[in-house]
Regions:
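Conserved short S/T/G-enriched processing/targeting/catalytic segments and their helical context
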Residues: 1
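Noncatalytic scaffold domains of N-terminal-nucleophile
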Residues: 5, 9-184, 188-211
Length: 211
């Protein structure tokens, strides 16, 4: 849709990058990070954006070791200590700044994802295949369980709607305020508090200082 409204490939990439958190949550989310390579046709320049996650300021070299000094996979893979400061929102915003047409705002590009999160997407294909594999892990988190599980604890079945109203609110904050809507204010405070409550070390300052 973006190119038909006068947008560039960069606009389209940002719009597409905003959708996986809603429609492909196990692999694409605003709590992660990534890389993007952009070719600027007008100047012939190639631009690379590194928006991978960064370690919280309180991270140490020994934080993933057990009492005997050996690596502990549970700490590094399945605990809140492993939560890095997310870069996706900053990366997509920078891509929009560097390669956008100037005709479409960040809100214009995120709005379709907001609608999908609010109105729901069908549980099909990858979501239907992978939810059963993640059922026990999802059930551990009170904020995720009502989204991906039914009231009886079973996973959403093919054909059911995946509704994500809280994600819609977060995306709306980003659309309204840009990266600050995610890295500062209520969203950042709730995110940092949830990580800390689960035993992690990420703080609101870590989020605010992400670059």
């Amino acid at each position: 849709e973006s190119p038909h409204r006068g947008g560039t490939a960069g606009d389209a990439a940002v719009a597409v990058g905003s959708a996986p958190p809603v429609s492909y949550p196990r692999a694409g989310n605003i709590g992660g990070g990534g890389f993007m390579v952009i070719h600027l046709a007008k100047t012939g320049q190639n631009v690379t954006i590194d928006y991978r996650e960064t370690a919280p300021a309180a991270a140490t070299a020994a934080m993933f070791l057990d009492a005997s000094g050996e690596p502990d996979p549970k700490k590094s893979r399945d605990s809140a200590l492993s939560v890095g400061v997310p870069g996706t929102v900053a990366g997509l915003a920078l891509a929009h700044e560097k390669s956008g047409s100037g005709k479409l705002s960040l809100a214009d590009l995120i709005d379709p994802a907001i609608a999908l999160a609010r109105n729901g997407v069908d549980v099909v294909d990858d979501i239907a295949d992978t939810l059963p594999l993640a059922q026990q892990r999802i059930a551990r988190w009170h904020s995720s369980a009502p989204v991906f599980l039914n009231s009886d604890g079973s996973v959403l079945a093919p054909g059911q709607d995946l509704l994500q109203p809280d994600l819609a609110v977060t995306l709306r904050a980003i659309a309204r305020d840009g990266p600050k809507g995610f890295y500062e204010g209520p969203v950042a405070e709730k995110l940092a508090a949830a990580v800390r409550k689960a035993g992690g070390i990420m703080t609101v300052d870590d989020l605010k200082n992400y670059r």
